[in-house]
């Protein structure tokens, strides 16, 4: 398929980080509000906020976020940022998106976690009204932070449950802070009733995927370490888990050292449920259309495959049953003309 056709395809995205996905124009706008100097030249600014094509590691990749953190410290900034990412998604025919963020990273200047979530939800709501997209929020804890900080944040933001906030996650340094370290807090938080997704297997540790599945988590981000792990793949499928794949990001961070190391083909051939995602649109210099192009190029992914992956994404989403039903209907209708070709 040509790029213009891939762009027209209806899409769903489950794994997109707010702070890693801001457009250059919005970064400039936020920098002006925060009175932070950033380059006016696009190429210079892009170099500042985009990770190298090949990083030394995940932690090397995550350094890029340090530039954005000071820009997301006010309600106005967070609302603008959320609206910006929804707009970017809608312009490439994303009909459903879950945008994740860590309130902790926007509390440097006195905002509470509740205020951070409220501001993000306001931006999502503006984007939904303007573009006809469904956009939800996932709150992340930071693995390397004190568990007490994450515990307090998760408890405090519950007032936004099912008002746009639909789930929780842990992001950050997976290697040193595996699921076992987080297990008790994850179980506590699951008791609140909102679902969990979890970054798992991004750092090359298959056992972390096992641990996440054993915690009853039904959506896992990246899962690159599942590659060539037949027993783990069988467990993944038996437990009805959906993979949130992030191809460009995984090559950058060396989670997958080569295209051949990326687990998509093994997941697809085994019948596992999966979704295609950007992870960080700006930090990885990508969007969903670019990701789809890469899947066509490297894996010969077909329109029928894309429909199936998007159906998997919507079914595994944290949207309400009624929203899922409407989104699946919208998705199927959008693909009819392409499937017939």
Curated annotation (Swiss-Prot):
Positions marked as site (Important for catalytic activity): 222
Pfam families: A_deaminase
Gene3D superfamilies assigned to the protein according to its UniProt record, in alphabetical order: Metal-dependent hydrolases (3.20.20.140)
InterPro entries per UniProt: A_deaminase, A_deaminase_dom, Ado/ade_deaminase, Metal_Hydrolase
Keyword Magnesium: no
Cellular component terms (Gene Ontology): cytosol
Catalyzed chemical reaction(s): adenosine + H2O + H(+) = inosine + NH4(+); 2'-deoxyadenosine + H2O + H(+) = 2'-deoxyinosine + NH4(+)
Binding site for substrate: 17, 19, 172
Catalytic residues in the record: 202
EC number: 3.5.4.4
Cofactor: Zn(2+)
GO molecular function, one term: adenosine deaminase activity
CDD domains: ADA
GO biological process, one term: nucleotide metabolic process
EC class name: hydrolase
Entry keywords, A to Z: Hydrolase, Metal-binding, Nucleotide metabolism, Zinc
Cofactor note: Binds 1 zinc ion per subunit.
Protein residues bound to Zn(2+): 15, 17, 199, 279
Biological role: Catalyzes the hydrolytic deamination of adenosine and 2-deoxyadenosine.
Xref: PANTHER family: ADENOSINE DEAMINASE
Family: Belongs to the metallo-dependent hydrolases superfamily. Adenosine and AMP deaminases family. Adenosine deaminase subfamily.
Protein name per Swiss-Prot or TrEMBL: Adenosine deaminase
Organism: Streptococcus equi subsp. zooepidemicus (strain H70)
Gene name for this UniProt entry: add
């Amino acid at each position: 398929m040509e790029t213009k056709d891939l762009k027209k395809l209806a899409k769903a995205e489950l794994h997109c980080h707010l702070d890693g996905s801001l457009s250059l124009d919005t970064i400039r706008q936020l920098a002006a509000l925060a009175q932070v100097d950033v380059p006016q030249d696009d190429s210079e600014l892009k170099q500042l906020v985009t990770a190298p094509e090949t990083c030394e590691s995940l932690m090397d990749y995550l350094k890029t976020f340090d530039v954005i953190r000071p820009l997301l410290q006010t309600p106005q900034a967070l609302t603008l940022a959320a609206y910006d990412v929804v707009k970017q998604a809608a312009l490439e025919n994303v009909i459903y998106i879950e945008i994740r963020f860590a309130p902790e990273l926007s509390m440097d200047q006195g905002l509470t976690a509740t205020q951070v979530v409220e501001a993000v939800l306001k931006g999502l709501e503006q984007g939904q009204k303007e573009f006809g997209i469904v956009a939800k929020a996932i709150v992340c804890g930071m693995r390397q932070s004190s568990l007490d900080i994450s515990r307090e944040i998760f408890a405090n933001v519950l007032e936004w449950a099912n008002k746009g906030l639909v789930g929780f996650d842990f992001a950050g340094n997976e290697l040193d802070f595996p699921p076992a370290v987080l297990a008790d807090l994850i179980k506590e938080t699951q008791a609140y009733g909102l679902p969990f997704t979890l970054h798992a297997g991004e750092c090359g540790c298959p056992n972390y995927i096992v641990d996440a599945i054993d915690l009853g988590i039904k959506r896992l981000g990246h899962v690159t370490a599942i590659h060539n792990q037949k027993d783990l793949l069988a467990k993944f499928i038996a437990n009805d888990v959906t993979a949130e794949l992030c191809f460009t990001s995984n090559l950058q961070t060396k989670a997958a050292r080569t295209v051949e190391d990326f687990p998509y083909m093994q997941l697809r051939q085994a019948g596992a449920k999966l979704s295609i995602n950007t992870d960080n649109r700006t930090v990885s210099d990508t969007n969903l259309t670019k990701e789809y192009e890469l899947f066509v190029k490297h894996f010969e992914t077909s329109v029928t495959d894309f429909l199936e992956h998007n159906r998997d994404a919507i079914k595994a989403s944290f949207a309400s049953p009624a929203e899922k039903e409407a989104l699946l209907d919208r998705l199927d209708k959008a693909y009819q003309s392409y499937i017939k070709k």
